[in-house]
Amino acid sequence: MSVPTVLERIIARKFQEVAERSARVSLAELEAMAKSADAPRGFAKALIEQAKRKKPAVIAEIKKASPSKGVIRENFVPADIAVSYEKGGATCLSVLTDVDYFQGADVYLQQARAAVSLPVIRKDFMVDPYQIVEARALGADCVLLIVSALDDVKMAELAATAKDVGLDVLVEVHDGDELERALKTLDTPLVGVNNRNLHTFDVSLETTLDLLPRIPRDRLAITESGILNRADVELMEINEVYSFLVGEAFMRAEQPGVELQRLFFPDQVKKAVVQPLD
């Protein structure tokens, strides 16, 4: 019997989590909460408009820890990080809500979103419509669907639920087969290419570059994971990828928003540093 991968362990835990949560708060109660939540802020629209201008459309991630790296940021105040990101030029935010593997929390999403005007994606491992409705009830504007964690029927069901409650969908792939499935099953314009293999946690930017020619022009390619320096950003921009999801590079910086600006908007950093002479 093979040892389950990290992703397989996470997914197994998610099914338990849904059972536990739905025993405490019914789907009907969640649906009522979702209807009374703040209106969605237009996650996909914000990214598409920025990328059309050939400007970096950055989804800045708020993430305390990961299974592969452990705790990434000790000084973790989601609202402060969100404000820093907004000042640094982020287009959207991503907030980890997985408790067991990423030390996330639902309240982190609420705190971050309340502190800024940016759209927010709930970054978690979606396996059941309950979690989608829960995301909207928490105030999320978008949800993540990870193709390697779902079959096509479930993927379509979750996307339909997202549409029903007014959420955008970011579909995540990390190889050609997953991309084909995503394009066939979903009509979301947001296609994230995760450069990190979720089974091995190895990272390669070539994953995005290899899949890019197969992503239709009417979809927005978003490169995820492994963007660590200016050269990585320039490599993507040369290949006409203007949308990025970045977490760790920012989370390890003392001021995440300043690091975002340094990586993606270096000209603005120079202007801020050079003061006019009296």
Curated annotation (Swiss-Prot):
The keyword Lyase applies. GO terms for biological process: L-tryptophan biosynthetic process. It is an enzyme of class 4 (lyase). InterPro entries: Aldolase_TIM, Indole-3-glycerol_P_synth, Indole-3-glycerol_P_synth_dom, Indole-3-GlycerolPSynthase_CS, RibuloseP-bd_barrel. Its EC number is 4.1.1.48. NCBIfam families: PRK00278.1-2, PRK00278.1-6, PRK00278.2-4. This is Indole-3-glycerol phosphate synthase. It comes from Pseudomonas entomophila (strain L48). GO terms for molecular function: indole-3-glycerol-phosphate synthase activity; phosphoribosylanthranilate isomerase activity.
